[in-house]
From Swiss-Prot:
One of its GO terms (cellular component) is membrane. This is Cytochrome P450 monooxygenase 45. It comes from Postia placenta (strain ATCC 44394 / Madison 698-R). The keyword Flavoprotein does not apply. Cytochrome P450 monooxygenase that is able to use trans-stilbene as a substrate for oxidation. The keyword Transmembrane applies. InterPro entries: Cyt_P450 (IPR001128), Cyt_P450_CS (IPR017972), Cyt_P450_E_grp-I (IPR002401), Cyt_P450_sf (IPR036396), Cytochrome_P450_fung (IPR050364). It is a single-pass membrane protein. The chain crosses the membrane at residues 24-44. Belongs to the cytochrome P450 family.
Amino acid sequence: MHSVLAQAASGALSFELRLGQSSVLTICILALLTFVLREIVLYFTRHSMPPGPFRWPLIGNALQLPQDHPWVKYTEWAKMYGPLMQLDVLGQHMLVITSAQTARDLMEKRSSIYSDRPHLVMAGDLAGFGDTLILQNYGEEFRYQRKLVSHSFSPSVIHRYYDLQEAAARRLVLAIIEDPDSLENSTRLHIASIILRMTYGYTVKGVDDPLFTTGIAVINGFSEATRPGAWPVDFVPILQYVPHWVPGFVFTRKAREWRGVLERAMWAPYHWCKENYARDAAHGLCLCGSILAAEGSQLSSDQEWLFVNAAVTVMGGGLDTNISTILSFVLAMLRFPEVQKKAQAEIDAVIGPNRLPLISDRHSLPYVRSVVTEVYRWIPAVPLGIPHALRQDDHYDGLFLSKGSVVVPNVWGMLHDPSIYPAPHEFKPERYGGLDAEMTKVTDIAFGFGRRACPGFYFAEGTIFAIVATVLAICDVVPTVDEHGQEVIPEVSLTSGAIVSPENVKCAFRPRSGRVKDILVEAVETEQE
């Protein structure tokens, strides 16, 4: 009896094993057939898709994506595959545009379907940046936020910030004359002071001011959270549900830290302004004060949430990019001293020796304007722009562009196209001929496309011009010397990230005369009274 049962059990087990093996085999065959059919479909579809580097099955171009300075590789690839190429990363399509005309055709002329942002799990969902103006998808909330910000940045009202920008520029130049090694830190402090005063009416007390340090921390967090390819959770969203204590999954802890910093950066300066703007009419000139004066208690909680997210974007969007531009300007003056001399000669001829340049002098200084424009072109602060996302399937120049594709404007490649800008690695302000129409072609690329173009362009332009013109009027930017008395000219070495800047820019700022330094000191002391 036992043997019969054993035989029966053995037979049943054998049958189940065979059935299980058969099921596994069937699943494997079906999976293989699905993969083969997908590849066949993709093979024929790719003939109408943009070209690009060879894609490996399943992972696509994941192993080919450069981790450092990706804009350089994309520009090289564009020479082989054309100005519109496609990369695939774990099933996610990425369109890289290295032609200004193509970028305008898609992101401006078809802006209704090219104005979304890619969904970033790490930065948007986990770290909390998803509701900020810079990462919002295009829609009613985005339009509301942009309307709030754009009014304070429009050309018709931007002049009211000139005194603020000029005063900060003068304090900065005096600081770096006295301590050239503080160039980056002093630039960060004084540009932040402009932005916090303009946005919230708040005057920064110094480098330890909590509103300043929190603002810097949130910018650093955003830059890290949005670093392309840095976070596996952006490609495998289910990873966001893994507990933070699991080894190797520290990103959830980092995201919580950044979310906390973001909330402080959003609400602390807003509450300060809300408590103080009514007591000081000057606060009505700031973005926050003007909104509170106009809307006041009529702001709903949802509108208030959107506003504080828009306001914190002003801080984040204007600080690191402007610092990058100033460091690039200083590097250019060190490497191309003949440009510095020519710009100083124009200032001397137009402004004279008895006063400091003003932002309102800009239209009388075409060569200085050209210097600023060439800085934007030579080292664009955001070399790959801020990615867009394609809302629906599209066709362009006979190519099929699929819904959901991440659209990356290769700003670096566009502004270093030798067919448009000969000798692109040379710093040549003369290439614009002093013509605003030629300079605008650069700024239209460097400051974004279509409905996602930077709303703070005119404000940033005023800040940069004030600093550049003041440096040129007051100082000679000169190299440091080594132990042998030889000049040390810094190389063009850039950081790698969403926002880039020159590394190790060491120099001295030598007053052109005792007279101009006295004028500077007197101006700073008068403004502080």
